[in-house]
């Protein structure tokens, strides 16, 4: 590719999916430029690596580019897209560029409605501990690496495979993981769940004859597609028919202790430095792949015991002082679908038993709020205190009765928790300050702008 394409421009370079690919391309020696609406830590990092970053979108930003990379979040009337089309510069979907990177190495693609980022991070960490030095592209910041991407010298590239826009069908990896299949982003599939499941089946058909599908058989929808997967399968989970199976599972001091039973290898005792049964499942996928690639057991154990987590995936900010005296424990999480939220809340209950759980949640997308409304009411009613913001639109138009106030009213009617509604995330710190107590566990949660709140809470109040 490099002898033809030397300069690659990214529209929306600061996004989680785009920035990782851009960083790998910079490190491969390409000239990389990009634009975004505002500066953030990601754009600053890319600029320090040598990328040319423009704030704001303008046709002049693509000057000299041989290709322009876009995500599905970029509108077709974006001035840089219009300029590229006018100049006949190839406009490349993000997933197609990721597929191009995968052609350079052997791809390990992690798919599923929930758990992709954590599972991708665990796989990359275990392979790195085993000396395989993988390249990785992750949808969140791997805390141990300080970045969401890294160019390794090894044979493998580990990356998330995104089903939200069906773009994972552009990838042709040699190993695939499917963590679960759930009803999300249903507009992509015409609100037809059968079409969504068929897309995951088609994803497995992208594997070569020597490829492997690593599938979580705890998920009923994954189990349903098993008969239609024609490539070799490794089943993982808690289920009795799993080939890589967790037994003797215990939650202790925010960590998960378990034994991984393996069909073709001895059992291995694991201490996972993450809470929650869902993270045990994610770790089993990493153990399955590492075992297949002959990573030593001691390296697997060390990687999982030392795993420092991923930014905004049950990210702990430590103890934050309370104005009235004492302190609370602050955790931040990206969860924005009821299934993910329930798993995170369960993990928090396991990690902090007998603590009062306070949640500040920003719903993400009006369509998701509408489609999962009753499930949101149920899961949000399981916490002890709740602050709820208006929906983060992600570019969507408002939908009647699918806004934050409607959700607040429904939760209040359910009668299990009294929600506090605020219009914006800027009001969240004060709202929390009015209800938080010494000894509480506070979780900020959502995929939108609420991600800025924990840093403000910790910075303003001081982290111990």
UniProtKB/Swiss-Prot annotation:
Molecular functions (GO terms): ATP binding; UDP-N-acetylmuramate-L-alanine ligase activity
Residues that hold ATP according to the record: 112-118
EC number of this enzyme: 6.3.2.8
Cell compartment(s), UniProt: Cytoplasm
Pathway(s) annotated for this protein in UniProt: Cell wall biogenesis; peptidoglycan biosynthesis
Reactions this protein catalyses: UDP-N-acetyl-alpha-D-muramate + L-alanine + ATP = UDP-N-acetyl-alpha-D-muramoyl-L-alanine + ADP + phosphate + H(+)
Domain of life from the UniProt record: Bacteria
InterPro entries on file: Mur-like_cat_sf, Mur_ligase_C, Mur_ligase_C_dom_sf, Mur_ligase_cen, Mur_ligase_N, MurCDEF_pg_biosynth, UDP-N-AcMur_Ala_ligase_MurC
Assigned GO CC terms: cytoplasm
Major enzyme class: ligase
Pfam families listed in its UniProt record: Mur_ligase (PF01225), Mur_ligase_C (PF02875), Mur_ligase_M (PF08245)
Predominant subcellular localization, coarse grouping: cytoplasm
GO biological process: cell division; cell wall organization; peptidoglycan biosynthetic process; regulation of cell shape
Alphabetic keyword roster: ATP-binding, Cell cycle, Cell division, Cell shape, Cell wall biogenesis/degradation, Cytoplasm, Ligase, Nucleotide-binding, Peptidoglycan synthesis
Family, similarity comment: Belongs to the MurCDEF family.
Role summary: Cell wall formation.
Name the UniProt record assigns to this protein: UDP-N-acetylmuramate--L-alanine ligase
Species per Swiss-Prot/TrEMBL record: Paraburkholderia phymatum (strain DSM 17167 / CIP 108236 / LMG 21445 / STM815) (Burkholderia phymatum)
């Amino acid at each position: 590719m490099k002898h033809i394409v030397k300069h690659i421009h990214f529209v929306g370079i600061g996004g989680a999916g785009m920035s990782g690919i851009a960083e790998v391309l910079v490190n491969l020696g390409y000239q990389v430029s990009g634009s975004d609406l505002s500066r953030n830590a990601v754009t600053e990092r890319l600029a320090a690596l040598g990328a040319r970053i423009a704030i704001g979108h303008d046709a002049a930003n693509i000057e000299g580019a041989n290709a322009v990379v876009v995500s599905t979040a970029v509108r077709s009337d974006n001035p840089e897209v219009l300029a590229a089309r006018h100049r006949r510069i190839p406009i490349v979907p993000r997933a197609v560029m990721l597929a191009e990177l995968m052609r350079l190495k052997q791809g390990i693609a992690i798919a599923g409605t929930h758990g992709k980022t954590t599972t991708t991070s665990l796989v990359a960490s275990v392979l790195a501990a085993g000396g395989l030095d993988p390249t990785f592209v992750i949808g969140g910041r791997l805390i141990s690496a300080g970045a969401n991407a890294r160019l390794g010298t090894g044979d493998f590239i580990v990356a998330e495979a995104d089903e939200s826009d069906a773009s994972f069908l552009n990838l042709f990896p040699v190993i695939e993981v499917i963590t679960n299949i759930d009803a999300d982003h249903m507009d992509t599939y015409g609100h037809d769940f059968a079409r969504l499941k068929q897309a995951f089946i088609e994803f497995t058909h992208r594997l070569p004859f020597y490829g492997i599908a690593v599938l979580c058989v705890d998920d009923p929808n994954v189990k349903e597609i098993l008969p239609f997967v024609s490539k070799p399968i490794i089943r993982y989970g808690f289920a009795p028919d799993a080939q890589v199976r967790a037994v003797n599972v215990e939650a202790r001091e925010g960590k998960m202790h378990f034994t991984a039973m393996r069909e073709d290898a001895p059992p291995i005792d694991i201490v996972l430095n993450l809470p929650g049964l869902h993270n045990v499942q994610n770790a089993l996928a990493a153990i399955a792949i590492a075992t297949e690639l002959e990573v030593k057991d001691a390296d697997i154990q060390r990687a999982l015991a030392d795993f420092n987590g991923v930014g905004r995936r049950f990210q702990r900010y430590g103890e934050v002082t309370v104005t009235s005296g004492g302190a609370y424990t602050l955790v931040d999480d990206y969860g924005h679908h009821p299934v993910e939220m329930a798993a995170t809340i369960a993990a928090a209950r396991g990690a902090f038993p007998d603590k009062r759980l306070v949640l500040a949640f920003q719903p993400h997308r009006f369509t998701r709020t509408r489609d999962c409304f009753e499930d949101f009411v149920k899961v949000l009613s399981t916490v002890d205190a709740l602050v709820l913001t208006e929906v983060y639109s992600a570019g969507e138009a408002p939908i009647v009765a699918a806004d934050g106030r409607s959700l607040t009213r429904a939760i209040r009617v359910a009668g299990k928790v009294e929600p506090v509604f605020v219009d914006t995330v800027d009001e969240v710190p004060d709202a929390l300050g009015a209800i938080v107590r010494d000894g509480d566990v506070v979780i900020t949660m959502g995929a939108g702008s609420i991600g800025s709140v924990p840093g403000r809470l910790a910075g303003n109040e001081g982290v111990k």
